């Protein structure tokens, strides 16, 4: 399809959907949307090749919503996503687009949620279900997810599901769906396994291929920072270390604009929030203050910042990483205006590394990592700024009266002038001390790990890993009842554990494959609920029945000895690159809060 419709209204979508799109600021469909929406409205199967950030979520959700039977309280649309983050994102998009379609219910299903909450939500009859393959397959086997009324199936980021080892689960799910349904498959690349699925399960699909033309200007210096510790503290440190005329900080939610603005105000920064709740008069007043220099920092959402064009902005901070590449490019494009150089910084959480890779892949360039500014730099910056203020006072002409006061202080207290000046300097520093204590937070050694992880992304099969004999003190050894005889590979185990347990793959330790079982190192402190979740988890359609090995050191020595005796080179298939080194490991409580947090539906 070559013709690109000028607006969404011309595509023939439900007026209530158009109302939501207008409110969200959608005007002109992207190429993938203009190509896919008419085909899906007609009931055709679609095979779409497009990068993340091309607008593919709207490309499949809008036409499927249009064809939905609101009165039927049963799953009619099923979306498979590789990660819980993407599942939540897609579910939120469906909810936003159907805001004015009264009676539409959307349910995300993924590992880590309590089953009773999911079962209760399923009994309410959601028309749209978005989930990860493992959890969806589990519900199908339990008989708690009824797909007899399904007419629309979407595979989002199919190549990512293949990479994470979920493709067998995907095929199992697709084999249980009624034959009379419509399928949309989206993938950034088209490996043979994805082609095989399209040939087996799709009916004469129309192939849509969209070439990414997202580019950034070379005069914008980009970098990212891997988040550790408190983001607000890091934000303040970056602002203090950076020379900027004005900066805009992008966040995802309206509440975040207020929270970040309040945090900056408490630390002496002249900032303001910009969100959709502001009336037009206040919005214009805020932007005018930014333009004329009475305001230096603006915290905004993507929607609120639409159309914002201020030449003073020299620094853009992505406090919350955008979910698509196009939004990232639009954000950072607001700096470096009027022939000036710009600077863009991206905060990346551990669980958001996939989004960073998507941005880099789409832009066809690598974004360098930066470190948190050191205390020495902050001390130097504060001293320089303080010296400027002192110099300004020295150049003023009204110091005579203060000189007289100084004489009184000096003669009364019998102090030498240097000690008195030091005392006054300490008093004058205010809330920003000129002498800063060394960093309390010790950064984990992420640099090589993260860079190596990205380099290994495309050549997993050729990687070799060093053997580690001992179990780290911050890890526990578990046994799972799947092994080489089941066709299991390390990538299958990593994908299942990371997705179902919401554990970053870097915190999965040594994995050893044996004939009928495998062993895996996981962080200490796993809750009973999470262990039960893993017990129900399936890999290649087989329950793993995870069990803690009490005498882990003895067991590890035993299996290592047996591996050497049998000369089984494949028994040591995966050893994490220092994930649990004592010097790099977070505290046990940090493991619990970061990796084992339970989420409700």
From Swiss-Prot:
Subcellular location: Cytoplasm
Enzyme Commission number: 3.6.4.13
Keyword Thylakoid (UniProt): no
Record's compositionally biased regions (Basic and acidic residues): 552-576
Short motif (Q motif): ranges: 6-34
Any single GO BP term: ribosomal large subunit assembly
Domain named Helicase C-terminal: residues: 231-378
Cross-referenced SUPFAM superfamilies: P-loop containing nucleoside triphosphate hydrolases
PROSITE patterns, per database record: DEAD_ATP_HELICASE, HELICASE_ATP_BIND_1, HELICASE_CTER, Q_MOTIF
Presence of keyword Transmembrane helix: no
Protein keywords: ATP-binding, Cytoplasm, Helicase, Hydrolase, Nucleotide-binding, RNA-binding, Stress response
Record region (Disordered): 552-601
Gene3D superfamilies: 3.30.70.330, P-loop containing nucleotide triphosphate hydrolases
GO MF annotations, alphabetized: ATP binding; ATP hydrolysis activity; RNA helicase activity; RNA strand annealing activity
Binding site for ATP: 50-57
Residues in the signal sequence: none
Motif DEAD box, residue numbers: 156-159
Domain Helicase ATP-binding: 37-208
Catalytic activity from the UniProt record: ATP + H2O = ADP + phosphate + H(+)
Example of a GO cellular component annotation carried by this entry: ribosome
Job description of the protein: DEAD-box RNA helicase involved in various cellular processes at low temperature, including ribosome biogenesis, mRNA degradation and translation initiation.
PANTHER family: ATP-DEPENDENT RNA HELICASE DEAD (PTHR47963:SF8), DEAD-BOX ATP-DEPENDENT RNA HELICASE 47, MITOCHONDRIAL (PTHR47963)
Family, similarity comment: Belongs to the DEAD box helicase family. DeaD/CsdA subfamily.
Protein name per UniProt: ATP-dependent RNA helicase DeaD
GN (gene name): deaD
């Amino acid at each position: 399809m070559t013709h690109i419709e000028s607006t969404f209204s011309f595509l023939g979508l439900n007026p209530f959907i158009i109302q939501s799109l207008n409110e969200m600021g959608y005007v002109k469909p992207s190429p993938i949307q203009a190509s896919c929406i008419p085909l899906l409205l007609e009931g055709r199967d679609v095979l779409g090749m497009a990068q993340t950030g091309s607008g593919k979520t709207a490309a499949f959700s809008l036409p499927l919503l249009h064809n939905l039977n609101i009165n039927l309280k049963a799953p009619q649309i099923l979306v498979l996503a590789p990660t819980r983050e993407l599942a939540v994102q897609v579910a939120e998009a469906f909810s936003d687009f159907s805001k004015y379609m009264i009676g539409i219910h959307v349910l995300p299903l993924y590992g880590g949620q309590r089953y009773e909450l999911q079962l209760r939500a399923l009994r309410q009859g959601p028309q749209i279900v978005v989930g990860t393959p493992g959890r969806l397959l589990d519900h199908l086997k339990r008989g708690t997810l009824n797909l007899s009324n399904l007419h629309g199936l979407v595979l989002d980021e199919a190549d990512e599901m293949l990479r994470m080892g979920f493709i067998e689960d995907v095929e199992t799910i697709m084999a249980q769906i009624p034959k009379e349904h419509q399928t949309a498959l989206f993938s950034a690349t088209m490996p043979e396994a994805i082609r095989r699925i399209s040939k087996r399960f799709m009916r004469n699909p129309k192939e849509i291929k969209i070439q990414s033309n997202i580019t950034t200007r070379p005069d914008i210096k980009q970098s990212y920072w891997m988040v550790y510790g408190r983001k607000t503290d890091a934000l303040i440190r970056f602002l203090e270390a950076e020379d900027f005329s004005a900066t805009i900080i992008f966040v995802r939610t309206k509440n975040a604009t207020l929270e970040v603005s309040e945090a900056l105000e408490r630390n002496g920064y002249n900032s303001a929030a910009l969100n959709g709740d502001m009336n037009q008069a206040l919005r214009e007043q805020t932007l005018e203050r930014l333009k004329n220099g009475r305001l230096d920092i603006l915290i905004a959402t993507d929607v609120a910042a639409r159309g914002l064009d201020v030449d003073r902005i020299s620094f853009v901070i992505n406090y919350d990483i955008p979910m698509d590449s196009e939004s990232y490019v639009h954000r950072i494009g607001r700096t470096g205006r009027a022939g000036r150089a710009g600077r863009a910084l991206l905060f990346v959480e551990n669980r958001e590394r996939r989004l960073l890779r998507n941005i880099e892949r789409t832009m066809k360039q690598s974004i360098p990592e930066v470190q948190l500014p050191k205390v020495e730099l902050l001390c130097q910056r504060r001293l320089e700024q303080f010296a400027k203020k002192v110099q300004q006072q020295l150049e003023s002409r009204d110091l005579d009266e203060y000189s007289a006061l100084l004489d009184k202080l000096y003669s009364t207290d019998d102090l030498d002038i240097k000690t008195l000046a030091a005392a006054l300097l300490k008093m004058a520093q205010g809330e920003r001390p000129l002498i800063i204590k060394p960093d309390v937070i010790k950064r984990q050694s992420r640099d090589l790990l993260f860079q190596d992880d990205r380099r290994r992304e495309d050549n997993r099969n050729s990687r070799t890993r060093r053997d580690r004999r001992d179990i780290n003190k911050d890890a526990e050894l578990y046994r799972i009842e799947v092994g080489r005889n089941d066709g299991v590979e390390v990538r299958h185990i990593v994908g299942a554990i990371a997705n179902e347990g919401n554990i970053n793959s870097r915190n999965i330790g040594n994995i050893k494959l044996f004939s009928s079982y495998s062993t895996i190192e996981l962080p200490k402190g796993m809750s009973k609920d999470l262990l039960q979740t893993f017990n129900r988890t399936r890999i290649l359609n087989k329950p793993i029945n995870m069990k803690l090995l009490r005498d882990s050191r003895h067991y590890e020595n035993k299996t290592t000895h047996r591996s050497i005796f049998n000369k089984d080179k494949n028994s040591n298939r995966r050893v994490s690159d220092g994930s649990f080194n004592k010097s790099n490991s977070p505290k046990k409580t940090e493991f619990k809060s970061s990796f084992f947090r339970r989420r409700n539906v």
